[in-house]
A protein has these predicted regions:
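N-terminal maturation segment of proteins
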Residues: 1-220
Length: 220
């Protein structure tokens, strides 16, 4: 059951799949909009129901495994129900950083690896647009992050969008690898899209999100 849950979660959250080392989803992002989070919520609810329907087990480790999985699922479901993904913005570990850091985790040894990288670069704008939709829904509900967090995130987005960013280094890595010229062109096109997507995110945070952000710093 746990393996099936991980497989289904990987399909819904390919970025998380890369972080977990689950192969087969490295060219995808998944849905980062409110609809995507609703799909994850349904998966969590469905898996929790399946655990409840299991017959009692007399084996210690099986009972413990069920309890651990149930606690994990319940915690994630509660987080979604509270709207946490709709205000998931901070300067250390939020989609703003994870979109970029995902490329660090992707293998770069083969043509297939670079095809996945090119695919993700070229579709990063869609993932970021979905993330903006979630943040906008959070604003509508009155769920926003602290102003200082937003300001730092704007700076981070501008760095990723600007000259000398990580994405330009990625272009150099592709040039040094044994990658066909046509694929290098796709990587460079994707880099342009990725940098532009981060600039759009910076503009959105500056012009739309920041005015509604919370003055008090989040603590605890």
């Amino acid at each position: 059951m746990a393996d099936h849950y991980v497989d289904q979660l990987a399909k819904l959250q390919p970025m998380l799949a890369t972080q977990m080392g689950v192969f087969g989803f490295d060219g995808q992002w998944g849905e980062h909009n409110p609809s995507g989070w609703q799909d994850i919520s349904m998966l969590l609810t469905r898996t929790l129901s399946q655990i409840q329907e299991l017959p009692p087990s007399g084996r210690h480790w099986e009972t413990l495994g069920r309890r651990v999985l149930k606690d994990h699922l319940s915690g994630r479901l509660e987080s979604i129900e509270l709207g946490d993904p709709l205000r998931d913005l901070n300067n250390i570990a939020s989609p703003i950083q994870l979109f970029r850091e995902t490329f660090d985790l992707m293998p770069k040894a083969s043509v297939d690896n670079w095809e996945a990288i090119a695919s993700r670069l070229g579709s990063l704008d869609g993932a970021i647009n979905g993330y903006i939709e979630s943040l906008s829904e959070g604003r509508r509900r009155g769920l926003t992050s602290a102003r200082r967090q937003v300001e730092v995130c704007i700076d981070q987005c501008c760095v990723n969008a600007g000259p000398g960013s990580y994405f330009e280094q990625l272009s150099g890595n592709a040039s040094n690898a044994e990658v066909p010229d046509t694929l290098r062109v796709e990587v460079d096109k994707g880099i342009t899209i990725a940098r532009s997507a981060y600039q759009c995110l910076a503009d959105h945070l500056q012009n739309e999100y920041l005015p509604d952000s919370v003055e008090a710093d989040g603590v605890g």
